[in-house]
A protein has these predicted regions:
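Short, hinge-like loop/turn segments at secondary-structure boundaries
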Residues: 10-15, 38-40, 65-69, 144-146
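Conserved, mostly hydrophobic/aromatic
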Residues: 22, 41, 48-51, 99, ...
Length: 172
């Protein structure tokens, strides 16, 4: 966050246009941005446009039971290795299972619940989603209308564990 703040100050000092949005990595299983970047952006009026809101399919239910349980061509193919490098930790699949549980409660898809959670967070303007079908995009757009109860938000969030070593994560 300090580097982004430095860029903002440099832009201001030189009369340049400042950044108005931050495209950061943020979802239910990767919430490191809550430490510094999100609060900085919120306090300075910079909108968040998080990428990977579905954690490369994990939060959409594509890997039920673990990485070996891939249910899509992408989750069974070479992308699986990238996903494993980016999302690891004992909290990942239990959180994904809670997303599935809450989705059933609201009669929505897990992907819709993951995006609705993100849209519930302060400062999030719009997540950057990736889809392979028009129907998936339509479902995710419909997530704008979903209101998740505070107790369900807490239930989704309570298993998260911060990453001990940020250098240990992979790249998307």
């Amino acid at each position: 966050a300090w580097q982004f703040a430095e860029l903002q100050m440099t832009a201001q000092a030189n009369g340049w246009a400042k950044f108005v949005s931050m495209q950061n990595h943020y979802n239910l299983v990767y919430r490191e941005e809550e430490r510094e970047m999100n609060p900085y952006c919120l306090s300075t009026g910079v909108d968040l446009t998080p990428w990977s809101p579905l954690a490369r399919g994990i939060l959409a239910g594509s890997y039920q039971g673990g990485f070996g349980g891939g249910s899509t061509d992408r989750s069974k193919g070479q992308d699986r290795q990238r996903t494993e490098g980016l999302y690891h930790g004992d909290h990942v699949f239990p959180i994904a299972e809670r997303v599935i549980e809450i989705a059933a409660k609201y009669e929505k898809t897990p992907a819709q619940i993951a995006v609705a959670w993100l849209l519930h967070k302060p400062g999030v303007a719009s997540p950057v989603v990736g889809v392979s079908k028009v129907s998936q995009l339509e479902q995710l757009v419909a997530a704008v209308e979903i209101q998740i109860a505070d107790e369900d938000v807490s239930y989704l969030e309570e298993l998260y564990r911060p990453v001990d070593n940020l250098l240990s994560i992979g790249f998307s």
